[in-house]
Amino acid sequence: VYSTKDMVNWTDHGSPLDLSSFSWADDRAWAAQTIERNGKYYWYICAHSKLTGGMAIGVAVADSPTGPFKDALGKPLFDNGSWDNIDPTVWMDEDGQAYLYWGNPHLYYAKLNKDMISFKGGIDAKAAVDKKREVGRIVMTEEGFGSPDVEKRDSTRKYKDCYTEGPWFMKRGKNYYMLYAAGGVPEHIAYSMCKKPFGPWKYMGEIMPLEDTGSFTNHCGVTDFKGKSYFFYHTGKLGGGFGRSVAVEEFKYNADGTFPIIHHTQEGVAPIATLNPYKRQEAETIAFSKGVKSEQTDDTGVYISEIHTGDYIKVREVDFGNESPDAFAISAACSSLGGSLEVHLDKEDGELIAKLDVTKTGGWEKWKTFSAQMLKKVTGKHDIYFVFKGLKGSKLFNF
């Protein structure tokens, strides 16, 4: 889980949920979504079921978005042995009715009870896929999603589009939206709209066209934050990263409520707030980093480790105000020779404004405060680079 106040500096809160939290699951913890209701946070997940051998939908609950989460049921929320059951998406309407959608290559749906961990039922008999009529399936049409259901598609025809996976269900104003990965492999993002939670849907076209993202899949999420709209998706462009990495673009809805075309960029979004250097800021609040890794323990929580010479952490839009600070302090732990931390302005080898040495503290989680006077005065807004120096090949300290 990551959080932000400014859209560019993100705080790593660690992993509050693990596949092992679900006794019935043994593999493939894929896409998920979380929602809040009455002070509780519900995390809808998909995973491979040991009970049926297919994919299943589960739900975990916590008192905080940072967890810890626990399996709310001790069993799947929905498990019929099908491999279709992936990528759950959840939305709660103004009247308090919550809805769950999921599926690849078909799109399934259910009404959630107020407890958020059981299905309400009452699904139309023609759409229901279970005897209890708790789960329905959307019938794909060319008008609704650009093509019919996969088993009804004509291989000799070229359709406008086709739903594949990764649904994102939401409402804005009077319109319901279904965003989804489309086109098979490789995937782009398309969407459909309607006036009622279960349709009838109308295909609206692409949002993010097929582009060189370095990933043959895509999966999006949309939110408004501090008066701006953001489109999250994933790429494979992060050098040294494993698999997929999260990206985000700012956008504005068209006047009629439809989406504009949104393109993948290298720059991402602009900051919408500043970072206060006169308050304690966690080392795991980062805009960009090189070399370092975050770790998590019960005693400390999340911290930055695997620090070696030449590594650095960047934070953006740090506002020092009109008067310069006199000193700089960090919390560090060290069980080796230690090293130094240099503070540079605006680039990795920019102006050096502070430097402090970290020495042995007696253990990798024996935390101690280290401080140093500022070498130069600094005012205004800057990007800050924390550059680590020390013996080559040696782990320097934890931060």
Predicted regions and their residues:
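Carbohydrate-active catalytic/glycan-binding domains of CAZyme proteins
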Residues: 1-355, 359-399
